[in-house]
Amino acid sequence: MNNVVIVDCIRTPMGRSKAGAFRNVRAEDLSAHLMKGLISRNPQLDPNSIEDIYWGCVQQTLEQGFNVARNASLLAGIPHTVAATTVNRLCGSSMQALHDATRAIMVGDAETCIIGGVEHMGHVPMNHGVDFHPGMSKSVAKAAGMMGLTAEMLGRMHGISRQMQDEFAARSHQRAHAATIEGRFKNEILPIEGHDENGILKLYDYDEVIRPETTVEGLSNLRPAFDPVNGTVTAGSSSALSDGASAMLVMSEHRAKELGLTIRARVKSMAVAGCDPSIMGYGPVPATQKALKRAGLSIDDIGMVELNEAFAAQSLPCAKDLGLLDKIDEKVNLNGGAIALGHPLGCSGSRISTTLINQMEHHDVQFGLATMCIGLGQGIATVFERV
């Protein structure tokens, strides 16, 4: 089997979905911008040698429909001989795109792939056109399709208080703001034009979604968003709604060395897992356990973790059962997470992987873990190794 490596990884800034920076920018343009960026940043790469593009996207309709991966690649001017496909594992879509490309390279069906994902939640809302089969109610609770209620359930089962959630959410914004001020996102963000609140075109090189003024006290005044009577999950302790894209250049290790490209990380192991849809947010636990076993590692071997923050009430139980709760400030989401940056569904898997690789380099650690929950009860995880 071929070793598979990450040569480059980038993302757009995260734009606010409601009247945000990308309100006049389409999903295909966000995607094409990154595809072009990967090629221009790596001039040794002949675009004709790219085998396939795997692009995550959840709401594959309207501007994100009809194979947005191919549409974006054509906009980007990538040679017509390069194939492209759109991948959907809901929240884990772009991490699944990475897994698909990795397997193709491992078995020799490809040497070079571009992977990534996009979601413009302002143009194509998360619930647009969703129509669950009525028969699902025989085996799955209706509330399992309501992500906020699954977070309420998981938090209650694990004794996660409102105070704990508000503290975790405030931490996300504070750390993301600090990362912005200190330039820790600079290496991963590829600036792109958008419009400010006055409609003026400007170059965005920072995340619009972060709220640096967020405090635990301010969050404590918010009403529960999903269970008005008994709930603890608020809009403030949930992932923000944002628009964005992310991308990676993935290669066989020997091809990267042939081209003289810097290898940033190796894909050490991958896993997906299912769990009860009513506690869909628990998926990272079984997925991570599988990935660690396949890598021959324990959680103590992992030096840096990116755990997608769908909800604080979901992230904390996962951290607890993975043995990370007392190590959060040492190695979990040190630049904040989706509560501050947002969770553009199809984008997030490669976004957290990109942030992870940059963090692994910054803190000089050998192994890193990126993992996330997936709607209707799944989890996905990837272990990376610095070479």
Swiss-Prot record:
From the Swiss-Prot or TrEMBL record, state where the protein is found: Cytoplasm
Q: Which UniProt keywords apply?
A: Acyltransferase, Cytoplasm, Fatty acid metabolism, Lipid degradation, Lipid metabolism, Transferase
Alphabetized PANTHER family for the sequence: 3-KETOACYL-COA THIOLASE FADA (PTHR43853:SF11), 3-KETOACYL-COA THIOLASE, PEROXISOMAL (PTHR43853)
Protein's name according to its UniProt entry = 3-ketoacyl-CoA thiolase
Q: What does this protein do?
A: Catalyzes the final step of fatty acid oxidation in which acetyl-CoA is released and the CoA ester of a fatty acid two carbons shorter is formed.
Q: Mind giving the lineage of the organism this protein is from?
A: Bacteria, Pseudomonadati, Pseudomonadota, Gammaproteobacteria, Vibrionales
Entry similarity comment:
Belongs to the thiolase-like superfamily. Thiolase family.
Q: What class of enzyme is it?
A: transferase
SUPFAM superfamilies under this entry? Thiolase-like
Q: Which NCBIfam families match?
A: AcCoA-C-Actrans, fadA, PRK08947.1
Show the Pfam families listed in the entry.
Thiolase_C, Thiolase_N
Give me any GO biological process, just one.
phenylacetate catabolic process
Q: In which organism is this protein found? A: Photobacterium profundum (strain SS9)
| Stretches of the chain forming a coiled coil according to its record | none
Q: What is its EC number?
A: 2.3.1.16
The record's subunit annotation is: Heterotetramer of two alpha chains (FadB) and two beta chains (FadA).
Please give the GO cellular component terms listed in this UniProt entry.
cytoplasm
Instruction: State the reactions this protein catalyses.
Output: an acyl-CoA + acetyl-CoA = a 3-oxoacyl-CoA + CoA
InterPro entries referenced in this protein's UniProt entry, alphabetically: FadA, Thiolase, Thiolase-like, Thiolase-like_sf_Thiolase, Thiolase_acyl_enz_int_AS, Thiolase_AS, Thiolase_C, Thiolase_CS
Quote the catalytic residue positions: 91 (acyl-thioester intermediate), 343 (proton acceptor), 373 (proton acceptor)
An example molecular function term from Gene Ontology annotations: acetyl-CoA C-acyltransferase activity
| Annotated pathway | Lipid metabolism; fatty acid beta-oxidation
